[in-house]
Amino acid sequence: MARIAGINIPPQKHAEIGLTAIYGIGRTTAQKICDSCGIARDKKIKDLTDGDLEKIREEVGRMTIEGDLRRETTINIKRLMDLGCYRGFRHRRGLPMRGQRTRTNARTRKGPRKSAAALKK
């Protein structure tokens, strides 16, 4: 089993798909990594040589991924909340911040509905 950036990559998957198991790497980035390393996108992870895996590790090592990316995202959201700007306020209240309607919908951000009886107490 290949291990890249502390993540076990599923060996039966294609290189392009397997790389998306790493937080911060999607399909497009995975394609760019495969192309820059000279690896066929449809080659299975288990068929990659140690040299290929080392090239991928080197390429992935230059990117902000996993814990660092999560930390950076959290810091950015905290900065918005500390600034007191509109987006920070919406984050703090748990509401959508990109202009979506909230009278109906927005259930993902707002969570499950609260019954009228629960609000009266």
UniProtKB/Swiss-Prot annotation:
GO cellular component term of the entry, any: cytosol
GO BP of this protein: translation
Record's keyword terms, sorted: Ribonucleoprotein, Ribosomal protein, RNA-binding, rRNA-binding, tRNA-binding
Spans annotated as Disordered: 93-121
Highest taxon of the lineage: Bacteria
UniProt cross-references to SUPFAM superfamilies, sorted A to Z: S13-like H2TH domain
The keyword rRNA-binding belongs to this UniProt entry's keyword annotation: yes
Role description: Located at the top of the head of the 30S subunit, it contacts several helices of the 16S rRNA. In the 70S ribosome it contacts the 23S rRNA (bridge B1a) and protein L5 of the 50S subunit (bridge B1b), connecting the 2 subunits; these bridges are implicated in subunit movement. Contacts the tRNAs in the A and P-sites.
Similarity annotation: Belongs to the universal ribosomal protein uS13 family.
Record PANTHER family: 30S RIBOSOMAL PROTEIN S13/40S RIBOSOMAL PROTEIN S18, SMALL RIBOSOMAL SUBUNIT PROTEIN US13M
NCBIfam families documented for this protein: uS13_bact (TIGR03631)
Quaternary state and interactors: Part of the 30S ribosomal subunit. Forms a loose heterodimer with protein S19. Forms two bridges to the 50S subunit in the 70S ribosome.
Protein name (Swiss-Prot/TrEMBL): Small ribosomal subunit protein uS13
Native source organism of the sequence: Methylibium petroleiphilum (strain ATCC BAA-1232 / LMG 22953 / PM1)
Encoding gene, per UniProt annotation: rpsM
